[in-house]
Amino acid sequence: MKIIHKGLVEYLPTFEAMKTFNAGRNADTEDELWVVEHPPVFTQGLAGKPEHLLIRDDIPVVQIDRGGQITYHGPGQLVVYTMIDFKRRKTSVRNIVSALENSIIATLAEYGIEAAADPKRPGIYVGERKIASLGLRIKNGSVYHGLALNVNMDLSPFTQINPCGYAGMEMTQIADFVQPCPAPDEVASKLTAHLETQLTPKADNNE
């Protein structure tokens, strides 16, 4: 699996690049993880309802093809796009989602943060506060989009939306629990290591 660090990049060109990558895949295309941050942007998923955008300002809203409702991306949030051929890996989308969840939880545990998935709501939570979001698109036996982990960012734009369609959802981030807060690059190193482990087919782990 190839890990590509793209730095701070605009959302829309990245979204187009994901679609292009997935459309051009063949049986030999190596899976990739794209590690990025984005300038401020709201992204509205396929199930998105306009009423979940509570306040319109100068932050752009981009309609995209992942599942789910509206969320926010901004600097200081670690985003990992998972370009994975799950058919070739002989796994399921549910297992991919579990791998993403487990990787986030394990990464946060390294910083002494106890987090968990919620079977009733997508994402990862510390208590009742959401610290990470997940959203995928399934096409041609592969997935793209991925996860977003709040590290050290301005959380106030989340008050302009119902995050992932949940009114009053409180958000949190690593900086609320760890000072000095680790840089996103450090968190990315830990998270991608866990992702590689979690996404490796179990048969390969036994070799």
From Swiss-Prot:
Residue numbers annotated as active site: C164 (acyl-thioester intermediate)
InterPro entries linked to this entry: aa-tRNA-synth_II/BPL/LPL, BPL_LPL_catalytic, Octanoyltransferase, Octanoyltransferase_CS
UniProt-listed Gene3D superfamilies: Bira Bifunctional Protein, Domain 2
Keyword annotations for this protein? Acyltransferase, Cytoplasm, Transferase
What the entry lists under SUPFAM superfamilies is as follows: Class II aaRS and biotin synthetases
Q: Cite the CDD domains for this sequence.
A: LipB
Specify where it is mainly localized.
Answer: cytoplasm
Reactions this protein catalyses: octanoyl-[ACP] + L-lysyl-[protein] = N(6)-octanoyl-L-lysyl-[protein] + holo-[ACP] + H(+)
What positions are marked as the site Lowers pKa of active site Cys?
K130
Q: Name one GO molecular function term.
A: lipoyl(octanoyl) transferase activity
Which residues are listed for substrate binding in this entry?
R66, G67, G68, Q69, I70, T71, Y72, H73, S133, L134, G135, G146, L147, A148
Pathways per UniProt: Protein modification; protein lipoylation via endogenous pathway; protein N(6)-(lipoyl)lysine from octanoyl-[acyl-carrier-protein]: step 1/2
BPL/LPL catalytic domain span: 27-203
Protein location? Cytoplasm
The biological processes this protein is annotated with in GO are: protein modification process
What is one cellular component GO term in this UniProt entry?
Answer: cytoplasm
Enzyme Commission number(s): 2.3.1.181
What this chain does, per the record?
Catalyzes the transfer of endogenously produced octanoic acid from octanoyl-acyl-carrier-protein onto the lipoyl domains of lipoate-dependent enzymes. Lipoyl-ACP can also act as a substrate although octanoyl-ACP is likely to be the physiological substrate.
Q: NCBIfam families, per this entry?
A: lipB (TIGR00214), PRK14342.1 (NF010922)
Other known facts: In the reaction, the free carboxyl group of octanoic acid is attached via an amide linkage to the epsilon-amino group of a specific lysine residue of lipoyl domains of lipoate-dependent enzymes.
**Entry's HAMAP family?**
LipB
Q: Which family does it belong to?
A: Belongs to the LipB family.
Q: What is this protein called?
A: Octanoyltransferase
Query: What organism, scientifically named, is this protein from?
Result: Neisseria gonorrhoeae (strain ATCC 700825 / FA 1090)
Gene that codes for this? lipB
